[in-house]
Amino acid sequence: MFTTYSSISSQDLTIEHWQKIAPLRARLRAILMASTLFGILSVEMSGTALAVCEGPGAPTTTQTKCLTAVQIPGNPLQSYDISWVNPDRAEYYLADRSNAGIDVINTQNLTFKRTIPGFVGAKLNANGTVNNNISGPDGVVSHGRWLYAGDGDSTLKVIDLNAPNDSAIKQSISTGGTTRVDEMALTTDGELLLAANNAEDPPFATLFLANGDGSSSHVTALTKIIIDDSIVPAGFGLSMEQPAWDPKTERFYVSVPVIAENPPDCNFDADSGPITCDGGLAVIDPATLAGVAAAVLGAFDPATNTGVVPLHACGPNGATVGVHDNLLLGCTPANNPSNTSTLVINATTKNFANIGNIVGSDEVWFNKGDRRYYTASNRNCKTTAPCPTAAQQAAVLGVIDSTSVLIETIPQSSGSHSVAADSKRNLVFVPQSAPVTVVIGGDTTNVGAGICGSTNGCVGVFIHDVKKDRDYHDRNRDR
């Protein structure tokens, strides 16, 4: 007597089950063409079994493979933003504007847990597209039991993950703007949080005292930080994007998509023609801000390792800290049409290297479990670079090793710009947009539906079998 995988419910499946199923899936497809085949890796939705991990988004030749898809109840995924993983809690969090809440997925058995409500949701323009600047939730990070999420009404929501939905939001703190609190970062101990109001003009960041490992919420806004007007001039819609915390230098590093005079006489006014200015990296030392209600960040000062570092050939969105205090920055032609690569810069020396054949990233993530960077590159070049227009771009999941070498790219649904990884399980989570036939501004390809096995959008789950790769390299090392 034996147990078939199709008889196991999705809630019973652990990572170990999924790993056993994956190699069987390909073999059984060659033997069986009946519909029962799809019970091996399927999801249930409205009573219908749906095949997942099909098509261009599930190649069999890559090291990073599509494992399954987690369906999100409620409205189809039209608009979502940043995602995060807390590996100690085995939880993935997605800022889901389409359902006006934070989706929570169990990363151990890969099942949907709940959506935490209380956000403004997707606010629409007259043509039905989403106005990202006033929609929410947006940025999200977590430490221990505490989840922090930005909302479209310029508030920071503080969520107790141990609480039920109706009492999960413990604080809602205004940053004093009129647009969204966007991307953010925590110190390693969870005691300080930096969040950017990217859509304000001029943009600003807020430094908060956070909850750390405390059992009650006492989050307090400490300092409002702007960048000097000579670097980020007001009135031109310039921005601040993803912060990241580097524990070695004890600094926050914030992506600044476009800065003036970089290079000299460049154009930073989108209304006057294509942007030709590169971006910068803002370096903030929170230790210097004690008791300071408002601060202005100027040009970079090597003596203090603070200020704005001009970047070359990069207008960054995402930022993440990897090995050796290197930061990977998601350069994108959405900020500077001439961008063709991804940048890695050392937090201490500011030495940098460009990674070719991958560009157009929003959120980027370093997974310490397999020592790889993952990029949500929704504006990667389809063929040759540069690729300044949307017609020349396509969404991919970029995979980069710790030596800053591109390993592979995997197609994703158009607009896919969010990624997070579970370092304990080496799972990578990538939200997929619902098709354009279902939602305005949705996926214009068949990639998302193939990954999801549905037309509602989903969270695609990818796996990197570290042991298999190491065994392969060991066998071939001396050949």
Show where each model-derived region lies.
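N-terminal secretory signal peptides that target proteins for export/translocation
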Residues: M1-A26
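Aromatic (phenylalanine/tyrosine) cluster motif
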Residues: F2-Y5, F38, Y472
